[in-house]
């Protein structure tokens, strides 16, 4: 198909765990409007992402992209480390 582009979703989040080999857990936040009270509420989601170089540390702000599954729970891949955590 000529001109087809990769339309994979990307998200930004914070690394909350890096205790596994080549894997990190990234927490992302999103704001939704409560249907009854009309207040914006923060919802968080934790996803596992593939980190091939083990470059991420806890607290790093990263960008991840959806990809083909690496395992049962790991369907996201690390794109870039946007900001390193302050020590």
Curated annotation (Swiss-Prot):
Keyword rRNA-binding: yes
One Pfam assignment: Ribosomal_S17
Lineage start: Bacteria, Pseudomonadati, Pseudomonadota, Gammaproteobacteria, Thiotrichales
Keyword Hydrolase: no
Coiled coil: none
Keywords: Ribonucleoprotein, Ribosomal protein, RNA-binding, rRNA-binding
GO cellular component terms attached to this protein's record: cytosolic small ribosomal subunit
Organism: Hydrogenovibrio crunogenus (strain DSM 25203 / XCL-2)
Taxonomy, superkingdom: Bacteria
Family recorded in the similarity comment: Belongs to the universal ribosomal protein uS17 family.
UniProt name for this protein: Small ribosomal subunit protein uS17
Job description of the protein: One of the primary rRNA binding proteins, it binds specifically to the 5'-end of 16S ribosomal RNA.
């Amino acid at each position: 198909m000529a001109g087809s582009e990769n339309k994979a979703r990307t998200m930004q989040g914070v690394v909350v765990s890096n205790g596994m080999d080549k894997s990190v857990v990234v927490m992302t936040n999103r704001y939704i409007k409560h249907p009854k009270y009309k207040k914006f509420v923060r919802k968080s989601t934790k996803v596992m992402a593939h980190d091939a170089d083990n470059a991420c540390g806890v607290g790093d702000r990263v960008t991840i992209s959806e990809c083909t599954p690496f395992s049962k729970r790991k369907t996201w891949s690390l794109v870039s480390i946007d900001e390193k955590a302050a020590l």
